[in-house]
Amino acid sequence: MEAEDCTVAVSEANLKDLLLALDVGNTNTVVGLFEGDKLRTHWRLTTHAERTADEVGMWLHQLLRWDQVRVDDLTDVAVSSVVPPMDPRLAEGVRRYLDKEAFFVEPGIRSDMPLSVDAPQELGADRLCDAVAAYAEHGGPCLVLDFGTAITWEVVSAEGEYLGGAIAPGPGVTADALSSKTAKLPSVAMEPPPRVIGKGTVDSIQSGLFYGYLGLIEGVTRRMLDELGDATVVATGGLAQAFASHTDLIQHVEPDLTLHGLRILWQLNRGEAG
């Protein structure tokens, strides 16, 4: 399964917009620069929740300089964050150094996607971005898996209604717990070993983690498809390609799905459509 470019058309009026998009996760922050609907470049950086507003602002300013973008040419800044303590400092850093009031994905924004869940205000920003982007690109019904610090599943109906999903600890969380809670088991890279039956400690751990998670992924996905019926299955996140190459359930791998969802939500709320 090859990674795909997720590009959703926008109005001609927005083709020259320069949007800086920040997907702030618990482990990594992905920063993307959009020119209209095209992702011009992106950077993946470690998330540091204790960053000050000045650090955030200088950090973003330097990324723009690296890509030879003048601050005055930037149209706006959009943020999807699952690290609430960072949000005020992100907003202040953007205000001071980029002279913008950042758009945040938060409860109450326009998404054009009905949220048929018990507590819509609790839906994570990244999960909404994933659902919106997958539906815009593939229509519905669709099911999205995002491999991050947590693994999330998002389900969207044929009519574009968000139906809910599931959340499980990600492979990295489990691997860290295993090495930190045991005296003799080492930390290992999350990758498929050469065989399922391990011949040593490292490949035995890799087998248990990788194929154990593969079973989790396939099990939850199949049960969701049993409830939903046939659907397009899309994966994103750091380990999406690795797992997609070992299962026939995942039809599309789109590494930049969350950023594209953030772009779409920004356009609905502040762009030409807003």
What are these regions (language model features)?
Residues 2, 8-10, 14-62, 160-187, ...:
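Short glycine-rich, Thr/Ser-proximal phosphate-binding strand/loop in the N-terminal lobe
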Residues 69-72, 137-139, 224-228:
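Glycine-rich phosphate-binding loop signature in dinucleotide/nucleotide-binding domains
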Residues 67-123, 159-166, 170-171, 199-210, ...:
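Short beta-strand-loop/turn "lid" adjacent to the catalytic site in phosphate-handling enzymes
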Residues 2, 9-16, 112-142, 263-270:
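Conserved phosphate-binding catalytic cores of ATP/NTP-utilizing and phosphoryl-transfer enzymes
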Residues 44, 140-176, 232-233, 251-257, ...:
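Glycine-rich phosphate-binding loop of actin/hexokinase-like ATP-binding domains
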Residues 55-67, 216, 220:
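Short, well-ordered amphipathic alpha-helical segments that serve as non-catalytic structural scaffolds
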Residues 19-23, 78, 142-146, 234:
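Short glycine-aspartate micro-motif
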Residues 2-10, 15-21, 174-274:
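ATP-binding/phosphotransfer module of carbohydrate and carboxylate kinases, centering on a glycine-rich
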